[in-house]
């Protein structure tokens, strides 16, 4: 049911329209300041642009030398350093983003670390560093530091080199590993050395005995020859005596 003075199009009034989205970021080339949106302009001061426009419902529109009008902002924006002075707003300047609120604070110079976000906040009292805690379940996906190297394996103990004077059986029978007492090892080495020396002397005695046996056999042969010669000479003498 509608009254006669009511406009039919206002029956379904859903409130004021939402604010328009911000325009795309402008290029880095400088453009002359716009003359729309108020009677006051932003005056450059060391790369900073401060707005002097009248406020409308607590908000104002600021613009800088890059031709970009900052929506829903109160105060000024420093484009070269990513700083925003004044009320709530968002802007993009020549080389950096800026966001801020309050009397003279800025938010920027941040970089991501291993966990959370690190940056600097400068208010009236100067620069203050802050580290925001990482949310629960946050995991840094960047390149991790170098992994710790595992400890090297223990080097094997060098084997004891064989002495040239040792008997091979002393190592083949692993008697050198049977004990760690150096005295016992020296005693076993001495026994093996004596055994080797005795074997060598025994071989020498055997060689001498074989030499003697050979000489004896030669003497026996010579003795047999001499006996035959004596017998032959005796027969020759007997034959001469019978002829005479």
From Swiss-Prot:
<keyword id="KW-0804">Transcription</keyword>
<keyword id="KW-0805">Transcription regulation</keyword>
<feature type="region of interest" description="Disordered">
    <location>
        <begin position="1"/>
        <end position="81"/>
    </location>
</feature>
<keyword id="KW-0175">Coiled coil</keyword>
<keyword id="KW-0156">Chromatin regulator</keyword>
<keyword id="KW-0010">Activator</keyword>
<dbReference type="GO" id="GO:0006325">
    <property type="term" value="P:chromatin organization"/>
</dbReference>
<protein>
    <recommendedName>
        <fullName>Transcriptional regulatory protein LGE1</fullName>
    </recommendedName>
</protein>
<dbReference type="InterPro" id="IPR021581">
    <property type="entry name" value="Tscrpt_reg_Lge1"/>
</dbReference>
<keyword id="KW-0539">Nucleus</keyword>
<feature type="region of interest" description="Disordered">
    <location>
        <begin position="132"/>
        <end position="164"/>
    </location>
</feature>
<dbReference type="GO" id="GO:0005634">
    <property type="term" value="C:nucleus"/>
</dbReference>
<feature type="compositionally biased region" description="Pro residues">
    <location>
        <begin position="15"/>
        <end position="27"/>
    </location>
</feature>
<dbReference type="Pfam" id="PF11488">
    <property type="entry name" value="Lge1"/>
</dbReference>
<comment type="function">
    <text>Involved in transcriptional activation. Also required for ubiquitination of histone H2B to form H2BK123ub1. H2BK123ub1 gives a specific tag for epigenetic transcriptional activation, telomeric silencing, and is also a prerequisite for H3K4me and H3K79me formation. Its precise role in H2BK123ub1 formation however is unclear.</text>
</comment>
<feature type="compositionally biased region" description="Low complexity">
    <location>
        <begin position="28"/>
        <end position="44"/>
    </location>
</feature>
């Amino acid at each position: 049911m509608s009254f006669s003075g009511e406009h039919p199009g206002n029956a379904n009034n859903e409130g004021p329209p939402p604010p328009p989205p911000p325009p795309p970021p402008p290029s880095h080339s400088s453009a002359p300041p716009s003359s729309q949106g108020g009677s006051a302009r932003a005056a450059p001061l060391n790369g900073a642009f401060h707005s002097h426009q009248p406020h409308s419902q607590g908000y104002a529109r600021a613009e800088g030398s890059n031709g970009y009008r900052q929506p829903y902002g109160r105060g000024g924006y420093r484009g070269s350093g990513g700083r925003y002075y004044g009320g709530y707003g968002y802007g993009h300047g020549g080389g950096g983003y800026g966001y801020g609120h309050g009397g003279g604070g800025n938010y920027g110079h941040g970089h991501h670390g291993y966990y959370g976000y690190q940056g600097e906040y400068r208010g009236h009292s100067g620069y203050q560093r802050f580290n925001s805690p990482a949310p629960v379940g946050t995991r840094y996906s960047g390149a991790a530091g170098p992994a710790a190297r595992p400890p090297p394996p223990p080097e094997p103990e060098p084997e004891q080199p064989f002495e040239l004077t040792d008997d091979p059986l002393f190592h083949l029978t692993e008697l050198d590993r049977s004990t760690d007492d150096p005295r016992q090892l020296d005693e076993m080495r001495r026994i093996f050395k004596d055994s080797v020396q005795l074997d060598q002397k025994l071989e020498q005695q055997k060689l001498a005995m074989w030499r003697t046996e050979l000489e004896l056999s030669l003497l026996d042969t010579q003795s047999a020859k001499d006996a035959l010669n004596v017998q032959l000479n005796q027969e020759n003498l007997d034959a001469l005596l019978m002829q005479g």
